[in-house]
Design a protein with these regions (language model features):
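Structural core segment of the AMP-binding/adenylate-forming
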Residues: 6, 13-81, 194-195, 200
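Conserved AMP-binding/adenylation subdomain of ANL enzymes
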Residues: 119-137, 147-189, 200, 204-208
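Adenylate-forming
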Residues: 49-58, 171, 188-221
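Conserved G/P- and acidic residue-centered "switch" motifs that form tight phosphate/ATP-binding loops
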Residues: 15, 104, 161
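Conserved AMP-binding/adenylate-forming core of the ANL superfamily
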Residues: 1-9, 26-35, 87-90, 113-116
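Short hydrophobic/charged patches on amphipathic alpha-helices used for structural packing
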Residues: 38, 87, 176-180, 210-212
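Conserved pre-ATP/AMP-binding loop-to-beta segment of ANL
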Residues: 80-107, 117, 121, 129-137
């Protein structure tokens, strides 16, 4: 959702600390998901919550009983009265954002990322890891709450000032061949994912589709 990116960077400008919460991936796990969200809201001392239409009801239910100032959809925030405020001057040791671990072996743990750490990491990725140039273009289907999705495909393209195209994670899960179709269409040079993503895509590709793909520009995978 593009609103996530707008709100994430708005928090940076305003001196607020954004925390990306995980999306529900299990069917029929409503209660467990809401309970997890509530624990994350409490652990992060969240005061304001924003969610797109598909997840807003979960977030509002999870926030019940908590002293949060506002939990609503992006449209509600955009409708708030405009007020001129001086921008916060970020310092290197200020907190940039909090990243929660996947929680595959235990409850997700919050990792505090400071601006100094974030910028050093981005410099290393852009200049040395990916060796990026102005001719690069990125493409991703990874969720923004995932470290690889947030750092690799939200922060990196902004830091490097290059274009990026996004495919909704759910769309990829249902039709993984779209990844290759969009790589062909956009001529993207950089797109990477966990190994299961390549496996899922390879298992869904049909022999008759192969001739329609042109991945010759894809240099980092």
């Amino acid at each position: 959702n593009p609103e996530f990116i707008r709100f994430f960077y708005a928090c940076q400008y305003a001196g607020l600390i954004p925390v990306a919460l995980p999306a529900s991936v299990k069917v029929g796990a409503h209660c467990a998901y809401v309970a997890q969200l509530k624990q994350l809201l409490e652990a992060s001392d969240a005061e304001i919550g924003m969610a797109s239409e598909g997840y807003l009801s979960f977030l509002q239910e999870a926030s019940e009983g908590l002293s949060m100032r506002m939990v609503d959809a992006p449209e509600a925030f955009h409708a708030l009265p405009f007020d001129v405020q001086p921008l916060h001057q970020a310092e290197p040791d200020d907190i940039s954002y909090i990243q929660y671990t996947s929680g595959s072996t235990r409850f997700p743990r919050g990792v505090v990322i400071k601006h100094r750490t974030a910028m050093a990491n981005l410099h290393g990725i852009v200049s040395h890891g990916l060796e990026m140039s102005g001719s690069d273009r990125m493409m991703s289907w990874l969720p923004f709450y995932h470290d690889m999705g947030l750092v690799g495909f939200v922060l990196v393209p902004m830091a490097a000032q290059i274009s990026i195209d996004y495919l909704d994670t759910r769309e990829f899960a249902m039709r993984p061949r779209q990844w290759l179709s969009l790589m062909t269409k956009t001529r993207a040079t950089i797109s990477f994912a966990p190994s299961f993503g390549y496996d899922l895509c390879a298992r869904r590709v049909r022999a008759s589709d192969i001739a329609t793909y042109d991945l010759s520009n894809w240099r980092v995978a």
